[in-house]
């Protein structure tokens, strides 16, 4: 029924029956990002015949049950200029109460992104795209760090960012270590693109990703013309392979007390009796003590 690049589908449990399935996509020929709806995920209809957002290329979307909204991450075009250089960056939009919002800039490459890229032998660092994961009242982002030698050629590594709540600033994990490096997969060490979100598999969360055998734009000259011999090599070898990153459920982020430390959790907005489940691991001789700050006598060990 419909077509598009960077196609993402999610379920909106609060939508009318005929729009239970939602989709976002890029259509280059129409110079925009589009949205669509479906009752069953099979027969689709565009929400409108003009772009929802005037840009194109990479777009991902998820439904966030804790925030009762869908979140869209999209590559911003035309590229904003940073220090006189056009840069790829991430914009954010949302779907609330059946209405799509305008997109606004959320993640723009900074000096640390460039410093990291230069330290690895590249000229600068862009943000190519981002998958996302609901996490309580917040959101985790898996950010595609495009470390490039020129506008076309480079590699994607994946780092983690997070947003504590709707409308708050996106923060990088301290130190910005690679979560997935393009050099990690033995089956493709060119560049990495993740899916829009992880999925639950038993007691684990799985994030599927595509690993390219060559760097981004390997078969394209700097003048943007296709190099025929390199393109044939890509056809013969295959462009990419699919892999998966796995971790124990809800153990993507953690806190380590070595040998001592404390962590305060602020649980806002609790309107009914709830359980606090601690996902922890103690080494030999270690212990965990839990207390409620507003009830000093309530301590468990």
Language-model regions: role of each:
Residues 1-125, 133-189, 202, 206-301:
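Beta-rich carbohydrate-recognition and catalytic domains
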């Amino acid at each position: 029924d419909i077509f598009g690049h960077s196609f993402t589908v999610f379920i909106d449990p609060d939508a009318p029956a005929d729009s239970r399935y939602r989709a976002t996509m890029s259509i280059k020929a129409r110079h925009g990002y589009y949205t669509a709806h479906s009752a069953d995920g099979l027969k689709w209809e565009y929400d409108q015949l003009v772009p929802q957002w005037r840009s194109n290329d990479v777009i991902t979307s998820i439904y966030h049950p804790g925030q009762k909204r869908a979140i869209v991450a999209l590559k911003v075009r035309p590229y904003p200029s940073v220090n006189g250089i056009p840069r790829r960056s991430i914009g954010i939009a949302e779907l609330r109460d059946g209405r799509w919002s305008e997109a606004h800039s959320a993640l723009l490459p900074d000096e640390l992104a460039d410093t990291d890229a230069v330290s690895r032998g590249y000229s600068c660092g862009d943000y190519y795209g981002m998958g996302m994961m609901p996490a309580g009242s917040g959101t985790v982002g898996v950010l595609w760090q495009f470390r490039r030698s020129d506008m076309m050629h480079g590699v994607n590594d994946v780092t983690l960012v997070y947003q504590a709540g709707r409308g708050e600033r996106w923060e990088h994990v301290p130190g910005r270590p690679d979560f997935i490096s393009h050099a990690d997969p033995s089956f493709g060490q060119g560049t990495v693109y993740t899916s829009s979100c992880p999925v639950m598999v038993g007691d684990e969360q799985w994030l599927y990703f595509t690993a390219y055998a060559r760097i981004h734009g390997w078969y394209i000259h700097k003048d943007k013309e296709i190099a025929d011999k390199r393109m044939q090599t890509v056809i013969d070898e295959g462009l990419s392979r699919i892999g998966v990153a796995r971790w124990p459920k809800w153990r993507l982020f953690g806190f380590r007390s070595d040998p001592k430390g404390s962590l305060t959790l602020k649980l806002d907005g609790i309107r009914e009796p709830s359980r606090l489940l601690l996902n922890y691991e103690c080494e030999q001789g270690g212990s965990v003590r839990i207390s409620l700050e507003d009830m000093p006598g309530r301590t468990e060990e």
